[in-house]
């Protein structure tokens, strides 16, 4: 019911929340140099679904876990962007061991627990800046 009301309030031709989040996830992955296979692991969907996301033929569903993981992934990107900028520094941070996290963030985010831990770590770091 709320989804219908939300869609009725949007101007004609405006993208829905699913399309917006899907594009944000794909753009964040592109900026961070993260492969479709890793994005699939993060979202808990198939690599084929991520490929369809990239081509605009699949949209994240706000009634499924993939939605929550997508929101966390975009949050991760926004935190990295605020702390390091979206460039080589963010990619290096993801790829290198982090003593506080106990591993490489890029590997950790492939699991639910790891994604949440990395996002919380970045939120705490961002809060100090």
Residue ranges and their predicted role:
Residues 1-129:
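Non-transmembrane "mature" sequence context
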